[in-house]
């Protein structure tokens, strides 16, 4: 049997379902998606429904996530009116974090390792924020594409550059998350297969590569958190354009 490190990213159909001509089959991707949504929703619900004077470990962990994202939000958007968008950023951070971490579990499936999934999230945020920005600011929205203090002859060229850089936001946001998750999990899979072969042939020295793979797992854990953090920061930056349309 040929070893394929990308096998872990294959979407497998578990139950074929059709609604007319529309394929709504249940896949491993679907199952993991529901596990993530139910998991972190249950975690937040239990935390706030069983709130006690002395917080439990779960309460302490969830409250720290909440405060961490709130601090991140306030650092990027210095506008009290914008706090109504904080739940969105908290959801984005929590969802991406859970999606990244669940892929590190045995037999886990990394949905953020698929460009179509990360692009759907990034484009939905980009499209929604753009609409809100346009309806809130009307014609002032277009100030985003006209840098202030620029000589008039250069404005047409800079407008083109600004428009292109604005339109590629969902692509850069989705590719960054997808590429990191794909590369990290592929490397982890390759090293795991290598260590398994070393263990079969040279059991006495197998602890050396084993220590290395433990280091890689810890590194992947950190990358999963960092990618959720970066995704949330960029979401905040895009939201900040609603209240700051001038360069």
Curated annotation (Swiss-Prot):
In alphabetical order, the GO MF annotations are: proton-transporting ATP synthase activity, rotational mechanism
Q: Which UniProt keywords apply?
A: ATP synthesis, CF(0), Hydrogen ion transport, Ion transport, Membrane, Mitochondrion, Mitochondrion inner membrane, Transmembrane, Transmembrane helix, Transport
What's the protein's topology in the membrane? Answer: Multi-pass membrane protein
TM helices/strands, residue ranges: 26-46, 85-105, 115-135, 141-161, 178-198, 205-225
What are the subcellular locations of this protein?
Mitochondrion inner membrane
**One term under GO cellular component:** proton-transporting ATP synthase complex
Q: Which family does it belong to?
A: Belongs to the ATPase A chain family.
Q: What PANTHER family does the record point to? A: ATP SYNTHASE SUBUNIT A (PTHR11410:SF0)
NCBIfam families linked to this entry: ATP_synt_6_or_A, PRK05815.2-4
What's the stated role of this polypeptide?
Mitochondrial membrane ATP synthase (F(1)F(0) ATP synthase or Complex V) produces ATP from ADP in the presence of a proton gradient across the membrane which is generated by electron transport complexes of the respiratory chain. F-type ATPases consist of two structural domains, F(1) - containing the extramembraneous catalytic core and F(0) - containing the membrane proton channel, linked together by a central stalk and a peripheral stalk. During catalysis, ATP synthesis in the catalytic domain of F(1) is coupled via a rotary mechanism of the central stalk subunits to proton translocation.
How does this chain assemble? Answer: F-type ATPases have 2 components, CF(1) - the catalytic core - and CF(0) - the membrane proton channel. CF(1) has five subunits: alpha(3), beta(3), gamma(1), delta(1), epsilon(1). CF(0) has three main subunits: a, b and c.
This one is known as: ATP synthase subunit a
**Gene name?**
ATP6
């Amino acid at each position: 049997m040929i070893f394929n490190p990308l096998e872990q990213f294959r979407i497998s159909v578990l139950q074929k379902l059709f609604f007319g001509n529309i394929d709504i089959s249940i896949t491993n991707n679907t199952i993991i998606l529901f596990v993530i949504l139910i998991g972190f929703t249950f975690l937040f619900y239990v935390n706030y429904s069983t709130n006690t004077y002395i917080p439990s470990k779960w309460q302490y962990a969830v409250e720290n996530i909440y405060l961490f994202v709130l601090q991140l939000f306030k650092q990027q958007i210095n506008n009290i009116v914008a706090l109504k968008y904080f739940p969105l950023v908290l959801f984005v951070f929590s969802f991406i974090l859970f999606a990244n971490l669940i892929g590190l579990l045995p037999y886990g499936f990394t949905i953020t390792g698929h460009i179509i999934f990360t692009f759907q999230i990034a484009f939905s945020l980009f499209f929604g924020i753009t609409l809100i920005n346009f309806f809130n600011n009307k014609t002032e929205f277009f100030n985003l594409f006209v840098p202030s203090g620029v000589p008039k002859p250069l404005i047409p060229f800079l407008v083109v550059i600004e428009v292109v850089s604005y339109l590629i936001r969902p692509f850069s946001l989705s590719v960054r998350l997808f590429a990191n998750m794909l590369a990290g999990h592929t490397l982890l899979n390759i090293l795991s297969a290598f260590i398994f072969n070393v263990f079969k042939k040279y059991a006495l020295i197998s602890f050396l590569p084993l220590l290395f793979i433990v280091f890689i797992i810890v590194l992947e854990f950190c990358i999963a958190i960092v990618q959720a953090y970066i995704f949330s920061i960029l979401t905040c930056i895009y939201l900040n354009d609603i209240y700051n349309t001038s360069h």
